[in-house]
Curated annotation (Swiss-Prot):
GO terms for cellular component: cytosol; nucleoid; protein-DNA complex. Residues 124-223 bind DNA. It is found in: Cytoplasm; Cytoplasm, Nucleoid. This is Transcriptional regulatory protein AfsQ1. One of its GO terms (biological process) is regulation of DNA-templated transcription. Pfam families: Response_reg, Trans_reg_C. Residues 3-116 form the Response regulatory domain. The gene is afsQ1. One of its GO terms (molecular function) is phosphorelay response regulator activity. It comes from Streptomyces coelicolor (strain ATCC BAA-471 / A3(2) / M145). Forms part of a two-component regulatory system AfsQ1/AfsQ2 involved in secondary metabolism. The keyword Transmembrane does not apply. Phosphorylated by AfsQ2.
Length: 225
């Protein structure tokens, strides 16, 4: 049974989502503020965090940043509007996905399960790209022999690119493969995740040699020369 931490200040929304997600088979702990949510996170280890953007005191963006300093738990943001700035800031803060309110419990449940599947083990082979080694059995990535701390979404994106070295994948292809949804052209999810992934796997993230941008298409993972 997946365990969730729901951080939402609106009592009605928090209660409704807690009830719906519990009925869907999740164990749900709740907090009404960012401070309380961070305290709960120190006391228990959820499988995933559902985090409202507009919180009293510490907002959802800052909560997300603080979590990402020490933890790679998957995070889904709840935002009241499909605002470009809110979405971009949220994704750059380290969120794996976002859902626009109002949201039905079963829709959020589908997103949660899709995010959790990204960390599931798959094939038993490994792949090497220079100093970068991807172990698909252990679901680990090392660079120069040191473990990299990737979120489930970052790991899944790297796995999908590594299956097709040298092949360009469009943003829409990556949305389907990694996020399991067509977001009506919302390539910001892909671009933000690539940016975070490059910061961890590239020697010089501003001049990437592994994860290359294919102009007008998307991205590819290049084997080292």
């Amino acid at each position: 049974m997946p365990s969730l931490l729901l951080i939402e200040d609106d009592d009605a929304i928090r209660t409704a989502l807690e009830l719906s997600l519990t009925r869907q088979g999740h164990r749900v702990a709740t907090a009404a503020s960012g401070e309380d949510g961070l305290k709960l996170l120190r006391e228990q280890r959820p499988d995933l965090i559902v985090l409202d953007v507009m919180l009293p005191g510490i907002d959802g963006f800052e909560v997300c940043r603080r979590i990402r300093r020490t933890d790679q738990l998957p995070i889904i943001l709840l935002t009241a509007r499909n605002d470009d700035i809110d979405v971009v800031v949220g994704l750059e803060s380290g969120a794996d996905d976002y859902v626009v309110k109002p949201v039905q419990g079963r829709v959020l449940d589908a997103r949660i399960r899709a995010v959790l599947r990204r960390g599931e083990r798959e094939s038993t082979d490994s792949a090497s790209f220079g100093s970068l080694v991807i172990d698909r059995s252990a679901m680990t990535v090392t660079k120069n022999g040191e473990d990299l701390q990737l979120t489930p979404t970052e790991l899944r994106l790297l796995l999908e690119l590594s299956r097709r070295p040298g092949q360009a994948l469009s943003r829409q292809q990556l949305l389907r493969l990694v996020w399991e949804h067509d977001y009506l052209g919302d390539s910001r999810l892909v671009d933000a995740c690539v940016q975070r992934l490059r910061a961890k796997v590239e020697d010089v993230p501003s001049s990437p040699t592994l994860i290359r941008t294919v102009r007008g298409v998307g991205y590819r993972l290049d084997p080292p020369q």
